[in-house]
Amino acid sequence: MDIIPEKRVELEKIDINYATARRISLLGGEPFFDPKTFVILEKLIEHNNTDCFISIVTNGSIALPKSKLDLLSKFTDLNICISIDGTGPVFEYMRWPAKWDTLLDNINSFQKITKNISISYTISSLNIFYHQQTIDWFNTQGIRYNHNIVTNPNWLSLDSMPVELKQLLDNNEFAQPWLTITGNEISLDKYKENIYAQDRAKRIDIKDYLPEISNILT
């Protein structure tokens, strides 16, 4: 049974038998920010069900106190899947306001309580330029990953990225399936408009994180 803790869900109304549940998946928002996550885990422990498979999808931004890590460590079949869409400043831009150093510390903490760590990597028209360095880092860390291709919002999809960007990706082997000019590409001006609107809302500047992309926009 998959349990997705959300603010609108009343825990007592969740239909789950804590003594016999074999699988529970805790997804987003951010499970480690939601107190219900740990209430569920504590109830499983109370029912001596620490063999239940626990899957948690996190953005890796929250440093857990030792008490929470100790609680997680009681489960013998624990998978933690971390959403990582780049390294260093690329990660910080894609997952703002998360910090890269905090993520690294959290990965280290997770690896002390389970060997089953994986990465979910979402690829868009922004981070495709950093694809090789991203997967090189995954491989260096020895962490399994799966990738997802953005289709929505349209302006971030690989199919619809501006022609000017597609032309700069000629040497990017991974990007080749999306480089054909179809006529569905958005204009570079529209692309810039969306990026700048996003940056204003976050009070950040893309040039501080993705200078290669910023140079294309100027």
Task: Report residues per predicted region.
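Exposed alpha-helical structural elements
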Residues: 10-13, 67, 90, 187-190, ...
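Distinct, well-ordered alpha-helical segments
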Residues: 38-42, 65-72, 130-132
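Conserved C-terminal portion of the radical SAM core fold
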Residues: 55, 76-81, 100-217
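Core AdoMet radical
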Residues: 1-9, 18-35, 47-65, 73-104, ...
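A generic secondary-structure signal
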Residues: 12-14, 40-47, 70-71, 106-113, ...
